[in-house]
UniProtKB/Swiss-Prot annotation:
InterPro entries xref list: DHquinase_II, DHquinase_II_CS, DHquinase_II_sf
Protein name, UniProt field: Catabolic 3-dehydroquinase 2
Originating species: Aspergillus fumigatus (strain ATCC MYA-4609 / CBS 101355 / FGSC A1100 / Af293)
GO biological process, one term: 3,4-dihydroxybenzoate biosynthetic process
Family: Belongs to the type-II 3-dehydroquinase family.
Length: 150
């Protein structure tokens, strides 16, 4: 069965309570359950992973090599700081989609730069938690189905 790894970075465990005017009221467990259900409906297994620690995220990316068809990642604040996560994603050669709940380009200047975007198969920014659904749709349609053709 094709598979997607969903990674959520720092502070995303606070979804539903942290700045709900920006991030909404959906909690991380609700988001993960919804993502798994949508993926299953498309015949795709989705595994979710969250960490507030850069090294643990890197370790999980490394573990995905050879076992995962696509990665969906919301790196949180590591978007703007982590060359190490960038290098891990490049190193495992698994296509990835970068997701952000808010429009990072409409926020503080320091949030405008991403160390991941230029290497991502796609970037989904500012669609709220629907961005995760869009990422699953894209991964299933464009990344996984393309692999099955070849």
């Amino acid at each position: 069965m094709p598979s997607i790894l969903l990674i959520n970075g720092p502070n995303l465990n606070l979804l539903g309570t942290r700045e709900p005017h920006l991030y909404g009221r959906t909690t991380l467990p609700q988001l993960e359950d919804n993502a798994k259900a949508l993926a299953a409906a498309k015949g795709v297994k989705l595994e979710s992973f969250h960490s507030n620690h850069e090294g643990r995220i890197i370790d999980r990316i490394h573990e995905a090599r050879g076992h995962t068809d696509a990665i969906i990642i919301n790196p949180g604040a590591f978007t703007h700081t982590s060359v190490a996560i960038r290098d891990a994603l490049i190193g495992v050669s698994v296509p990835f989609i970068e997701v952000h709940i808010t429009n990072v380009h409409a926020r503080e200047e320091f949030r405008h730069h991403s160390y991941l975007s230029d290497k991502a198969a796609a970037c989904i920014i500012g669609l709220g938690t629907y961005g995760y659904e869009a990422a699953i749709e894209y991964a299933a349609r464009e990344i996984i189905s393309a692999k099955e053709v070849y």
